[in-house]
């Protein structure tokens, strides 16, 4: 049986010079967290697990040479200004990639048990996750973290890239590159770089240049000016100050929910599966017969959740007239001039779709109205809107920044929608002995009340989509009983 290395520090495959990389303003404005992906594989015996770990480890070493910024640590940039962050790469830079045998942990089911139950993650997030991901992101935090866990009959890879460095698209691209390098290690192929060559320094400088601003373009209504240190995207100096700020924000949120008559509870995560046939049927139902009202499958999927949740909650009876659905657009190809798809960074724009609640709550009109609202919001995006956001961030005093309005986040008639369907996590092979993951899961936190969140997972090999919803127990129960919703959706699993 091959032995497994106990040196968890992974260094770049080729020497990387010490350097400091200035990030862009959109990078600095990104959420300060490291979203963790879980990849599940069946594994036959410790020997296969050991071989898989060593392949992933050398694949990671190659990735660090391909994308050196991943080996760095986050720091304040120009004159300590929180709008300008940087990544410092030392001459001995490395990334920690831990493995752990957790097969004896009673709380963690066997691989077969997880597969039979839809791969829920209740109760063992802290055991599986890299330690770095369990605390707040602060000055000195690494740009990525990873851990491989051996369970009974399988393996679970938990890894994440700092959102400060990578938005959703870039996160997917980094995962694809790691998988490609690991696969080539398993095949005995010599190292070569696979990341597309991009003028990163020029792009970051462009994204940090104060744009010409059309003063007639208003800021999005879901944004608000916030004291910098109270914003959700503020980079704190240390864990203690970050935890204090988090506690203060949570207390404020709980007080707001209680004042609105809501009882805060532990958020629930429910996974639903949509087959290619049901997605096609859903799109046809949401589009109707008017050829001028074309919608995408994703518009229809968002419309289903948005309309059925609105109908169940019936918030128009409480005096609310409109609902907002916020989603993020990757604008690499929409900006003029475009940003190359291979660029690693944050190039997204938050967008909100608006729909009257009386239309959303209509059993016959809700799906079509919601889907059309999503389509119009997508089509209506303009570069001037993004430039207004960037201009405002760069023009505010140092002690102020832009953040998502807490009022929006805590209003239950609103919704978040996140589309990760184009990501290749479920279809990329990581080489022998692991191969293609059976399933992926993303570990995220949820609100104790307020707006529901919907996440579309990476497409499965058969074309199906899994979608997860953060919601209250009451909303979850109502969706189980909703005939129209269950006509399209198949329950997969749930966890807290």
Curated annotation (Swiss-Prot):
Domain of life: Eukaryota
Name of the protein described by the UniProt record: Acyltransferase clz6
Naturally occurring in which organism (per UniProt): Cochliobolus lunatus
InterPro entries cross-referenced by the UniProt entry: CAT-like_dom_sf, Plant_Fungal_Acyltransferase
Broadest EC class assigned to this enzyme: transferase
Listed PANTHER family: FATTY ALCOHOL:CAFFEOYL-COA ACYLTRANSFERASE, TRICHOTHECENE 3-O-ACETYLTRANSFERASE
Function noted in UniProt: Acyltransferase; part of the gene cluster that mediates the biosynthesis of squalestatin S1 (SQS1, also known as zaragozic acid A), a heavily oxidized fungal polyketide that offers potent cholesterol lowering activity by targeting squalene synthase (SS). SQS1 is composed of a 2,8-dioxobicyclic[3.2.1]octane-3,4,5-tricarboxyclic acid core that is connected to two lipophilic polyketide arms.
Keyword Mitochondrion tagged: no
Pathway in which the depicted protein is active: Secondary metabolite biosynthesis
Subunit structure: Monomer.
Known EC number: 2.3.1.-
Amino-acid biosynthesis keyword on record: no
Active site: 163
Keywords: Acyltransferase, Transferase
MF terms (GO), sorted A to Z: acyltransferase activity, transferring groups other than amino-acyl groups
Database matches in Pfam families: Transferase
Similarity comment text for this entry: Belongs to the plant acyltransferase family.
């Amino acid at each position: 049986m091959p032995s497994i290395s106990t040196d968890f520090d992974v260094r770049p495959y080729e020497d990387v010079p010490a350097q400091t990389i200035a990030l862009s303003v959109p990078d600095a404005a990104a959420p300060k967290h490291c979203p963790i992906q879980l990849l599940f594989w069946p594994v036959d015996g410790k020997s296969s697990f050991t071989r898989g770990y060593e392949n992933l480890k050398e694949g990671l070493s190659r990735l660090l040479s391909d994308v050196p910024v991943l080996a760095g640590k986050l720091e304040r940039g120009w004159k300590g200004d929180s709008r300008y962050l940087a990544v410092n790469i030392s001459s001995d830079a490395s990334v920690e990639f831990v493995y752990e045998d957790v097969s004896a942990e009673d709380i963690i089911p066997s691989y077969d048990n997880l597969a039979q139950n839809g791969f829920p993650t209740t109760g063992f997030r802290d055991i599986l996750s890299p330690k770095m991901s369990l605390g707040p992101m602060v000055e000195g935090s690494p740009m990525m973290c990873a851990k491989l866990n051996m369970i009974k009959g399988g393996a679970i890879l938990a890894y994440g890239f700092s959102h400060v460095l990578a938005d959703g698209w870039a996160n997917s691209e980094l995962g694809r590159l790691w998988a490609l390098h690991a696969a080539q290690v398993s095949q005995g192929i010599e190292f070569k770089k696979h990341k597309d060559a991009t003028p990163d320094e020029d792009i970051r400088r462009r994204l940090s240049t104060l744009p010409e601003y059309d003063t007639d373009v208003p800021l999005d209504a879901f944004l608000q000016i916030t004291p910098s240190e109270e914003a959700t995207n503020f980079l704190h100096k240390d864990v203690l100050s970050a935890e204090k700020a988090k506690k203060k924000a949570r207390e404020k949120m709980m007080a707001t929910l209680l004042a609105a008559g809501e009882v805060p509870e532990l958020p629930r995560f429910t996974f639903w599966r949509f087959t290619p046939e049901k997605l096609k049927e859903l799109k046809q139902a949401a589009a109707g017969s008017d050829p001028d009202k074309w919608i995408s499958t994703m518009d229809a999927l968002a419309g289903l959740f948005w309309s059925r949740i609105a109908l169940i909650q019936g918030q128009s009876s409480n005096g609310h007239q409109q609902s907002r659905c916020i989603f993020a657009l990757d604008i690499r190809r929409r900006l003029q001039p475009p940003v190359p798809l291979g660029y690693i960074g944050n190039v997204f724009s938050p967008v909100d779709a608006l729909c009257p609640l009386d239309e959303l709550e209509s059993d016959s009109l809700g799906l079509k109205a919601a889907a059309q609202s999503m389509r119009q919001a997508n089509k209506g995006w303009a570069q001037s809107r993004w430039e207004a956001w960037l201009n405002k961030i760069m023009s505010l005093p140092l002690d102020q920044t832009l953040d998502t309005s807490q009022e929006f986040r805590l209003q239950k008639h609103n919704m978040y929608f996140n589309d990760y369907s184009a990501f290749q996590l479920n279809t990329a092979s990581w080489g022998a002995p692991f191969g293609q993951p059976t399933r992926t899961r993303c570990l995220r936190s949820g609100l104790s009340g307020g707006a529901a969140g919907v996440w579309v997972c990476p497409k499965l090999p058969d074309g199906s989509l899994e979608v997860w919803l953060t919601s209250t127990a009451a909303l979850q129960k109502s969706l189980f009983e909703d005939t129209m919703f269950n006509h399209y959706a198949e329950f997969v699993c749930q966890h807290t």
